[in-house]
A protein has these predicted regions:
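A short local loop/turn or secondary-structure capping micro-motif enriched for an aromatic residue
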Residues: 50-53, 87-89, 108-112
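Short, acidic/hydrophobic/Gly-rich beta-strand patch recurrent on exposed beta strands
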Residues: 89-96
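Phosphoinositide-dependent membrane-docking surfaces
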Residues: 41, 66-84
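Short glycine/serine/proline-enriched coil/turn segments at secondary-structure junctions
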Residues: 25-26, 84-86
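Canonical phosphoinositide-binding patch of PH/PH-like domains
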Residues: 96-111
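Anionic N-terminal interaction surfaces
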Residues: 1-53, 62-63, 68-69, 100, ...
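Short, compositionally biased
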Residues: 57-59
Length: 118
């Protein structure tokens, strides 16, 4: 059963869901669920973890008072993994030069990378 609460297209396949931090350059740090599908990257923001609690409404879609960030796969230009002993991150760079960082803390980013690269 799919974990993502965001409505998926009929032909869209969920590849995985993980609870992560999500950092939007100059837009904040959020804690929530990252879902990777074969068509999109969907981030359900449960909590604004940044000092600046202003949400950039241009990126987010609201469904039933819940905030979702949706990035179509075709907008992603590059996927850049960064691994250190205490911090594992993936930077997604879009075709409009926005950077979105998936911060998975000390946990392995390999399953997320596999889903993103498939």
């Amino acid at each position: 059963m799919a974990k993502c609460k965001f409505p998926l297209d009929v032909d869209e396949k969920e590849l995985g869901t993980w609870t992560t931090n999500f950092i939007i350059t100059e837009g904040g740090r959020y804690l929530g669920d990252l879902t990777v599908t074969d068509k999109r990257i969907i981030y359900f923001s449960k909590f604004d973890a940044s000092l600046n609690a202003v949400i950039n409404k241009a990126f987010f879609k609201t469904i039933d008072q819940e905030q979702y960030l949706v990035i179509p796969r075709e907008k992603i230009q590059s996927i850049i993994p960064k691994k250190s002993m205490l911090n594992k991150r993936i930077t997604l760079v879009t075709d409009d030069d926005n950077e979105f960082i998936v911060d998975y803390g000390m946990l392995s980013i390999d399953p997320i990378l596999k889903a993103l690269e498939s």
